[in-house]
From Swiss-Prot:
Protein's UniProt name: Flagellar biosynthetic protein FliP
Organism the protein comes from: Treponema denticola (strain ATCC 35405 / DSM 14222 / CIP 103919 / JCM 8153 / KCTC 15104)
Keywords, sorted A to Z: Bacterial flagellum, Bacterial flagellum biogenesis, Bacterial flagellum protein export, Cell membrane, Membrane, Protein transport, Transmembrane, Transmembrane helix, Transport
Primary residence: membrane
Superkingdom in the source lineage: Bacteria
Organism phylogeny: Bacteria, Pseudomonadati, Spirochaetota, Spirochaetia, Spirochaetales
């Protein structure tokens, strides 16, 4: 114990002893004055000074610009949620997860890979809509032809049309949310507020994704039931049927070109 205490005291003295550091300079022999090679007029790179201050606006234009900047930053922060809920990503990600579970695959493909596949399929499906937003909203705003408010309205139109197009054949969810908001029955797309359209679109996408998932599960459930009955008839009760049925599911999925059929039907469902 005393030995450990002495070691701690020794290292503590080393840490707290002041160390004098001498700069390297060239001193002629026999003199105490020296010359350094550094240029006295040369300044080292400095970190720029950034000042965040609150001041009173001089004109109404300053107030409007501050509000616009705040709205723009808010939209950037919620952009991932908008991508998830207002595009085809929601349906694609849910269906791909259903496929993974129906094939009894636990780790392959990973969730990050499925999300990446859903993301790029979303870009492929939404590319015409994004092109309209770029041509009608972003490009004129960047060139100074329109303001932020008009750019927002122009960007909103293609997204509203895409969401309404998916529910045009079955507008039940739109009517439900309109009734919950105590609004009259809409006759056209212009009569539906954006917040109601987004809520109805989310519910519609969840419904469609689960319907597709049920149809995907049916053939694989039949394989599980056949394998389980065969194992029970052979007396192999302790053997998990999932381990035996998974290779047969993969063989069936590969033989019918499952990925090609799945992606093709998903793409057609958005047309």
């Amino acid at each position: 114990m005393k030995k450990n205490l002495l070691i701690l005291v020794f290292f503590g003295m080393i840490l707290f002893i002041p160390v004098q550091v001498f700069s390297q300079s060239r001193f002629p022999e026999g003199t105490t004055a020296g010359r350094t090679d550094a240029d006295p007029n040369r300044q080292a790179g400095r970190i720029p000074f950034i000042d965040f201050s609150i001041r009173e606006p001089s004109t109404n234009k300053d107030v409007a610009f501050s509000v616009q900047l705040l709205i723009f930053i808010t939209l950037i922060s919620i952009a991932p949620s908008l991508l998830l809920l207002m595009t085809s990503f929601l349906r694609l990600s849910i269906v791909l997860d259903f496929v993974k579970r129906a094939l009894s695959l636990q780790q392959v493909p990973p969730t990050q890979v499925l999300n990446g596949i859903a993301f790029f399929l979303t870009l492929f499906i939404m590319w015409p809509t994004f092109t309209q937003i770029y041509n009608n909203a972003y490009k004129p705003m960047s060139e100074g032809q329109i303001g932020i408010e008009e750019a927002y309205r122009e960007a909103e139109k293609p997204m509203r049309y895409f969401m309404y197009k998916q529910m045009q054949k079955n507008p039940t969810h739109i009517r439900t949310f309109m009734a919950m908001s105590k609004l009259p029955k809409p006759d056209t797309l212009a009569d539906v507020p954006t917040h109601i359209l987004i809520a109805a679109f989310i519910l519609h996408e969840l419904t469609i994704a689960f319907q597709i998932g049920i149809f995907l599960y049916l053939p694989f459930i039949i394989i599980d039931m056949i394998v389980a009955s065969i194992l029970m008839s052979m007396g192999m009760i302790m053997l998990p049927p999932v381990q035996i049925s998974m290779p047969f599911k993969l063989i069936l999925f590969v033989m019918v070109d499952g990925w090609g059929l799945l992606f093709g039907k998903l793409f057609e469902s958005f047309l």
